[in-house]
Design a protein with these regions (language model features):
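Phosphate/pyrophosphate-binding catalytic cores of soluble transferases and nucleic-acid-acting enzymes
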Residues: 1-308
Length: 308
């Protein structure tokens, strides 16, 4: 029987941190970060990374594990996170995954072996160029749907790496990715997933407040420091919301007001995409984070069936 992990997800600024820390303290959990930006060292303010005080309240994993110059893949996250989970459980503790990166959760719950037999760098580069063009992700996903509808249905168009890999395998072998031998794999652990939500107007107001606090805490200075340390502006990490909007300001290409406007707008759009993604996931408990019994609902859901 698979060991069960708890997962707390939801859009940015929905209150995941406070609830996860309470769960961790009460139920002897160690937190595994499920955020694609908090993995990067030196990117603290713009990623809303757990503070030193918060990290002192519970053991945190998968934070500060990569340099901003690295291209950290979903597959690498899956491998490292599963290793963390196994270690946590081997020591008799609970693993609580916390974050809003849907691709990471999908990789853990529905792992898909990418296959190493067929690979061609020129084909991959060609597909990557298409993906980088306007409407490119949609175009690639449509191509995949035409030749391999089963895999296309499984993969979101934003899962560009896996869409490209599926197309690459098809072009090299002439067989749909879904029909390749031993392609699909079973999840290593069982995941009990809860997602936070709240009225959109309140969520957007919280996003505005969070960004204002980030700016007060020195977000602009953090971006400048990263650039001066040699992190290229086109590094994958610097394309994250909070950094890509502030880079033009740090380089004198735009005003602070323009940068902040773009940052707040993009963050609202991102929160909306996060909610849309999670609604596609199966077996998710939705909890209004503003309800007085939000914690009690989470606790009851996670511990159901356990001996008291």
């Amino acid at each position: 029987m698979k060991e069960t992990c708890w997962v707390l997800t939801g859009p940015t600024a929905s209150g995941k941190t406070a609830l996860s820390l309470r769960l961790a303290r009460t139920h002897d959990c160690e937190i595994v970060c499920m955020d694609s930006m908090q993995i990067y060292r030196g990117m603290d303010i713009g990623t809303a990374k757990p503070t030193a005080d918060e990290r002192a309240q519970a053991v945190h994993h998968m934070v500060d594990v990569a340099d901003p110059t690295e291209d950290f893949s979903v597959a690498r996250y899956q491998e490292m996170a599963e290793s963390c989970i196994a270690d946590i459980q081997s020591r008799g503790h609970r693993a609580l995954l916390v974050g809003g990166t849907g691709l990471y959760l999908r990789a853990l719950r529905q792992p898909m072996a990418m296959g190493e037999a067929a690979a061609n760098e020129s084909i991959r580069q060609e597909l990557q160029q298409i993906a980088g063009a306007p409407g490119g992700k949609e175009q690639l996903h449509q191509q995949l749907a035409a030749v391999d509808p089963d895999t296309a249905q499984r993969l979101h168009l934003n899962d560009v790496r896996r869409v490209i890999r599926a197309l690459e395998v098809y072009r090299l072998t002439g067989r749909p990715f879904s029909q390749q031998p031993q392609i699909k794999t079973d999840s290593r652990f069982s995941y009990r997933v809860a997602s936070l939500t709240m009225p959109r107007d309140i969520l957007y107001a919280r996003i505005e407040q969070r960004i204002d606090q980030m700016l007060a805490d020195g977000l602009a200075e953090e971006v400048s420091r990263l650039l001066k340390s040699g992190v290229p502006r086109d590094a994958k990490a610097m394309k994250a919301i909070g950094y890509k909007e502030m880079i033009p300001y740090a380089l004198g290409e735009t005003t602070l007001d323009e940068a902040v406007y773009a940052l707040k707008l993009n963050t609202r759009h991102y929160a909306k995409r996060q909610l849309t993604w999670m609604r596609r996931e199966e077996d998710v408990l939705w909890v209004d984070a503003l309800e007085p019994d939000a914690y009690d609902k989470l606790e009851a859901y996670y511990t159901q069936g356990e001996a008291k």
